[in-house]
């Protein structure tokens, strides 16, 4: 009898433990307190220092940090707009996740996934302070502190083996400091090309998850595991320097196209050109340009009294879009008096040239680029021989530039022999003043004997030019400098119409090493004048 009693006791123990655990689990997740007591409220001045330290994380940033500003007006705006924002955001969520749900249907015996309810609740997020940054870039940079303790009603229904499983998200909390950059700033509405978002610290995420009516987050250990996993995953994707880029404007219209390469053009020779002069000869020269450029066309020398000229002259043209730009070649007869007669022309799309490949063209000259009008012209206008090579720029990081210069001396020699493009962007100036009451400032860029000017702005001490100039170079400008002068020009009848408001000499070694500098400089011979200049060096 004692043996059977021992066996039954062991069986009862083995069966009782799982049953007890299951019953305890359901009692834990379904039990709700019947009576809740709220703590007494006391004035803040009556609290101790330890209590204040506990409350410190909940105090708005504009109270703790003077760099953060209050944005009550923005919170009111969000509050009034929240019912409409709720529906708009939920509509975007529905359309975005439907394809994801479709991928899971048929796997793990899932027959359907759909939202039974989808609402972000009645409590909008609030911004507890905003910090703005001043940068030298064309961007608007700010950091809002966002807190959202919402009451969303999000119910997802999964149908598995004809069984409906309801999953409900409740009591969502999300606290984060977000860095937002609107860039680049543009003259096209809405005046910025994209929104770049990143998190400055790990976000605080808290929520309840009910499955079949029970709170799954009440299971010991599961809540902390899920919370840490979400923080880790979100931080790995969006914690600075990782960013989320949201394009606003199309790339074709978002910004001014930057140079992407150099087109090396060799004008070799021409044959059997038209006779335009009275003596049966011509004085030909070639004008060459790229479509879509506002820069003046480049010209060869004039070959006097020659219908079969030999030039062998070389030019470099800046390419911004090799897929759409076209090289336009025009042959003119030079005349001392009156306009120059066009002997013929031809056009070469850059798409016909592979990057890095040298290609020679022997072109039949035509009257004009209009195919319909030119088809009726049977006159032979001669031939033009040119040699083309398109060399795209290389995008290199600072680290790669420095490593390439430190690895070998031979590689260093190759680096110093690379041709490239020096771009100088004169952005703006501040507090430039001369002897006269009103200044009409403009900037002059001086480099290797070349002089380039910005437009003149009338009656201002804080001009904004935003103009860029390019210099094509055969080698990097090592141990060289560039001078930028700010001048003022009188608009009336003055004996001394020009006046220098200040200047700056910029060493280009840092530009060659780093590829780019973007700084503000104090003007020499100016009391408080500052000029903002960006310089880029791009190798081909």
UniProtKB/Swiss-Prot annotation:
Family membership noted in the UniProt record: Belongs to the synaptotagmin family.
Q: What is this protein called?
A: Synaptotagmin-3
What residue spans carry the region label Phospholipid binding?
227-509
Gene Ontology biological process terms in this record: lipid transport
Q: What does this protein do?
A: May be involved in membrane trafficking.
Residues recorded as binding Ca(2+) 2, renumbered to this chain, are: 277, 333, 335, 341
Q: Which residues form the C2 domain?
A: 240-363, 401-521
**Required cofactor(s):** Ca(2+)
Instruction: Name the membrane topology term.
Output: Single-pass membrane protein
Keywords assigned: Calcium, Lipid transport, Lipid-binding, Membrane, Metal-binding, Repeat, Transmembrane, Transmembrane helix, Transport
* Pfam families in the record: C2, SMP_LBD
Q: Which residues are listed for Ca(2+) 1 binding in this entry?
A: 277, 283, 333, 335
Can you name a GO cellular component term?
membrane
| Residues that span the membrane, as ranges | 9-29
Domain SMP-LTD as annotated: residue spans: 67-249
Query: One GO MF term, please?
Result: metal ion binding
Q: What's the source species for this entry?
A: Arabidopsis thaliana (Mouse-ear cress)
Q: Main site of residence?
A: membrane
The answer to whether the entry has keyword Transport is yes
Tell me where it resides.
Answer: Membrane
**InterPro entries, per the entry:** C2_dom, C2_domain_sf, SMP_LBD, Synaptotagmin_plant, Synaptotagmin_SMP
């Amino acid at each position: 009898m004692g043996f059977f009693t021992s066996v039954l006791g062991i069986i009862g123990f083995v069966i009782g433990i799982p049953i007890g655990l299951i019953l305890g689990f359901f009692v834990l997740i379904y039990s709700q307190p019947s009576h809740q007591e709220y703590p007494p409220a006391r004035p803040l001045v009556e609290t101790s220092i330890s209590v204040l330290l506990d409350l410190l994380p909940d105090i708005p940033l504009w109270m703790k940090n003077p760099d953060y500003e209050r944005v009550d007006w923005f919170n009111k705006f969000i509050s009034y707009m929240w019912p409409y924002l709720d529906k708009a955001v939920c509509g975007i969520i529905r359309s975005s996740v439907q394809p994801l749900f479709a991928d899971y249907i048929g796997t793990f015996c899932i027959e359907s996934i759909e939202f039974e309810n989808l609402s972000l609740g009645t409590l909008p997020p609030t911004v507890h302070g905003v910090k703005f940054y001043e940068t030298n870039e064309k961007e608007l940079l700010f950091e809002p502190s966002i807190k959202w303790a919402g009451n969303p009603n999000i119910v997802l229904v999964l149908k598995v083996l004809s069984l409906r499983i309801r999953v409900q998200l409740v009591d969502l909390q999300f606290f984060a400091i977000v860095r937002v950059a609107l860039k680049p700033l543009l003259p096209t509405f809405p005046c910025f090309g994209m929104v770049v978002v990143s998190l400055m610290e790990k976000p605080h995420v808290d929520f309840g998850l009910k499955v079949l009516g029970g709170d799954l987050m009440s299971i010991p250990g599961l809540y902390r595991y899920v919370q840490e996993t979400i923080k880790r995953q979100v931080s790995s994707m969006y914690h600075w320097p990782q960013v989320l880029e949201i394009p606003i404007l199309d790339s074709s219209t978002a910004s001014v196209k930057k140079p992407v390469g150099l087109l090396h053009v060799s004008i070799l020779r021409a044959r059997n050109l038209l006779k335009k002069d009275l003596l049966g000869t011509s004085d030909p020269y070639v004008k060459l340009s790229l479509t879509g450029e506002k820069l003046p066309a480049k010209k060869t020398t004039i070959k006097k009294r020659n219908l079969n000229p030999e030039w062998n002259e070389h030019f470099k043209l800046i390419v911004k879009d090799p897929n759409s730009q076209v090289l336009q070649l025009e042959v003119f007869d030079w005349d001392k008096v009156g306009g120059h007669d066009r002997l013929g022309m031809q056009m070469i799309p850059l798409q016909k040239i592979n990057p890095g490949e040298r290609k020679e063209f022997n072109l039949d000259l035509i009257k004009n680029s209009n195919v319909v009008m030119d088809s009726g012209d049977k006159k032979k206008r001669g031939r033009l021989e040119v040699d083309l090579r398109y060399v795209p720029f290389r995008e290199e990081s600072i680290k790669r530039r420095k490593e390439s210069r430190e690895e070998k001396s031979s590689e260093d020699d190759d680096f110093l022999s690379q041709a490239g493009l020096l771009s100088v962007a004169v952005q703006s100036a501040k507090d430039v003043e001369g002897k006269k009451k009103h200044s009409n400032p403009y900037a002059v860029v001086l480099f290797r004997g070349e002089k380039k000017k910005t437009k003149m702005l009338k009656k201002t001490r804080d001009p904004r030019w935003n103009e860029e100039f390019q210099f094509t170079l055969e080698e990097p400008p090592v141990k060289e400098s560039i001078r930028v002068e700010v001048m003022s020009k009188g608009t009336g009848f003055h004996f001394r119409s020009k006046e220098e408001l200040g200047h700056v000499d910029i060493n280009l070694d840092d530009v060659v090493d780093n590829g780019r500098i973007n700084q503000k400089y104090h003007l020499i011979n100016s009391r408080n004048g500052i000029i903002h200049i960006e310089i880029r060096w791009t190798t081909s």
